[in-house]
Curated annotation (Swiss-Prot):
Keywords: ATP-binding, Ligase, Magnesium, Metal-binding, Nucleotide-binding, Tricarboxylic acid cycle. It comes from Bdellovibrio bacteriovorus (strain ATCC 15356 / DSM 50701 / NCIMB 9529 / HD100). This is Succinate--CoA ligase [ADP-forming] subunit beta. Residues 9-244 form the ATP-grasp domain. Heterotetramer of two alpha and two beta subunits. It comes from the Bacteria. One of its GO terms (biological process) is tricarboxylic acid cycle.
Length: 387
């Protein structure tokens, strides 16, 4: 689950991470009032969407007067902001964050994340803050430094100091950086983050170490432990079909292709997406029905897939372990009848009760194309949508 920048800063402040004064606004009038309350003579108007790269897209503006605060807010509210993370369709800006300006001397990058290679948390930092870290990794990988964190003791002060020196921080601010890094790590662990990213962390000309922008993503499996975090969820920033899928415990991610996929198991689902692309087509979604799906769940999955007007065909790929093939077949038949399915449907079944499942599909009288294996399934659905 993602949250907005202003919410991430609220969370981080609780753990001692220093931020600038800021206030949320939904209109030019609120923005001006916020700027007056914050004080000073320079403010930053920031569009609040669940995506990075806002500055390049025109979603971050420095205002040097209250009139400019009003002007920039008026332009941002309601605009469709397109960044490298939103895709070409962009996201509509519904609110802005008015933040105090500061005298930036140097920008850095720092993040806590899970290192899949070690199975531990890690802290990454770079002297090249304010840039997309993916670009830094590609063009100057040596600029990124990393420390692995032992979960039994957490981030040790010597590790934080070492990281600060590795990215070129001045000795005079290292102690402040150590406190900052510790707060970031503590927030990461306490709230069950999958990533907590500060980009940029800035050192001001006055020698302060501050969080200028923040991104936090939380493990959705842990949200039952964090009702305060759940309250921060902004459904307006999420794909409606993904919200609907979550109500039925379906793991669903909308994609840009035209072949709908219904699969059990995340690994098999990813392999299914890959083989569709291998055969020259594009998947419309990732959908894992899980191991305990029933007829009703399969029907809801079909409904969600078919709400996407780009879907020209559906591939069902099931390996029956806990999930029995006859249960899937029953769900496929029920969904096809209830929805009056008009797009090609290819079904590949393997595993528990596979023969019974295939028999049910064959005797259903519906236009369902069986497939013997994954390659056969991909070839058949691609051929079907291409006519």
């Amino acid at each position: 689950m993602n949250i907005h920048e202003y919410q991430a800063k609220e969370v981080l402040r609780k753990f001692g991470v220093a931020t600038l004064k800021g206030k949320l606004a939904h209109s030019p009038e609120e923005a001006v009032a916020a700027a007056k309350e914050i004080g000073g003579s320079v403010w930053v108007v920031k569009a609040q969407i669940h995506a990075g790269g806002r500055g390049k897209g025109g979603g971050v503006k420095v205002a040097k007067s209250l009139d400019e605060v009003s002007e920039f807010t008026k332009k941002m509210i309601g605009m469709t902001l397109v960044t490298h993370q939103t895709g070409p369709e962009g996201k509509v800006v519904q609110k802005v964050f008015i933040e105090q300006g500061c005298n930036i001397a140097k920008e850095y990058y720092v993040a806590c994340l899970i290192d899949r290679a070690t199975g531990r948390a890690a802290m990454m930092a770079s002297s090249e803050g304010g840039m997309d870290i993916e670009e830094v990794a590609e063009h100057n990988p040596d600029a990124i430094k990393k420390v692995d964190i032992d979960p039994t003791v957490g981030l040790m002060p010597f590790q934080a100091r070492e990281l600060a020196f590795q990215i070129g921080m001045e000795p005079a601010i290292v102690n402040k950086a150590v406190k900052f890094f510790a707060g970031l790590y503590n927030a990461f662990v306490a709230t069950d983050c999958s990533i907590a990213e500060i980009n940029p962390l800035v050192v001001t000309k006055e020698g302060d170490v501050l969080c200028l922008d923040a991104k936090m993503n939380f493990d959705s499996n842990s949200l039952f432990r964090h009702p305060d975090i759940v309250e921060m969820r902004d459904l307006n920033e999420e794909e409606p079909s993904e919200i609907e899928a979550s109500k039925f415990d379906l793991a669903f991610i909308k994609l840009d292709g035209n072949i709908g996929c219904l699969v059990n198991g995340a690994g098999l689902a990813m392999a299914t997406l890959d083989i569709i692309k291998l055969h020259g087509a594009e998947p419309a979604n990732f959908l894992d029905v899980g191991g305990g799906a029933n007829k009703e769940k399969v029907t809801e999955a079909f409904k969600i897939i078919l709400k996407d007007k780009n879907v020209k065909g559906i591939l069902v790929n099931i390996f029956g372990g806990i999930m029995k093939c006859d249960i899937i077949a029953e769900g496929v038949i029920a969904a096809s009848k209830e929805l009056g399915l008009k797009v090609p449907l290819v079904v590949r079944l393997e595993g528990t009760n596979v023969e019974l499942g295939k028999k049910m599909l064959k005797e259903s009288g519906l236009n369902i194309t069986p497939a013997d294996n994954l390659t056969d399934a991909a070839k058949k659905i691609v051929a079907a949508i291409k006519g």
